[in-house]
Amino acid sequence: MAAFAARYARAFADVVAEAHLPLEQVQQQLDDFMATWNGAADLREVFLDPSFPAEEKVAILDRMNQKLGLAPVVRNFLAVVLQHERMHAMEEILKEFREEMNRRLGITAVSITSARALNEAERKSLLEQVGTLAEGRVDASFHEDASLLGGVVVQIGSKVYDGSVRGRFARLEEQLAVR
């Protein structure tokens, strides 16, 4: 991790908090920008080219903003990142930003992996149980891994709760090998 990514993330989190912007709105706008960024190779090429003048990069950002409708705070943050030639680390900066905001809001990031896609009712039920385990609000990312065979694996920080069929088989195999 680049140390500057954490600094940019903390500074942006400070600005978002001072502006009293809803985190969901800010995150959605950043996601929209990143979707545009990831979908346009020519845009990435220009924004990553240090020989391209920063003023022109910001002008391009402002034209993009006419379609994206970014909050001034979000637009200004992206302009600073562009002016300081840090776009190459944007994914890392945004990851750090999300983690910083979660820390400030007392939200625990969790990863939930299931053997198949979970429907909305299953997700809601699982999130309630995971919230109890995490002792608070959670920001969950859901993943699928058919090799689990069934059940779920929940990761809260460095702690892993393995309720998968594959995990049960592995534990059974260990018990049988000991005997």
From Swiss-Prot:
It is a peripheral membrane protein. Keywords: ATP synthesis, Cell inner membrane, Cell membrane, CF(1), Hydrogen ion transport, Ion transport, Membrane, Transport. The keyword Acetylation does not apply. It comes from the Bacteria. GO terms for molecular function: proton-transporting ATP synthase activity, rotational mechanism. Coiled coil: none annotated. Pfam families: OSCP (PF00213). Gene3D superfamilies: N-terminal domain of the delta subunit of the F1F0-ATP synthase. GO terms for cellular component: plasma membrane; proton-transporting ATP synthase complex. It is found in: Cell inner membrane. Belongs to the ATPase delta chain family. F-type ATPases have 2 components, F(1) - the catalytic core - and F(0) - the membrane proton channel. F(1) has five subunits: alpha(3), beta(3), gamma(1), delta(1), epsilon(1). F(0) has three main subunits: a(1), b(2) and c(10-14). The alpha and beta chains form an alternating ring which encloses part of the gamma chain. F(1) is attached to F(0) by a central stalk formed by the gamma and epsilon chains, while a peripheral stalk is formed by the delta and b chains. F(1)F(0) ATP synthase produces ATP from ADP in the presence of a proton or sodium gradient. F-type ATPases consist of two structural domains, F(1) containing the extramembraneous catalytic core and F(0) containing the membrane proton channel, linked together by a central stalk and a peripheral stalk. During catalysis, ATP synthesis in the catalytic domain of F(1) is coupled via a rotary mechanism of the central stalk subunits to proton translocation. PANTHER family: ATP SYNTHASE DELTA CHAIN. This is ATP synthase subunit delta. The gene is atpH.
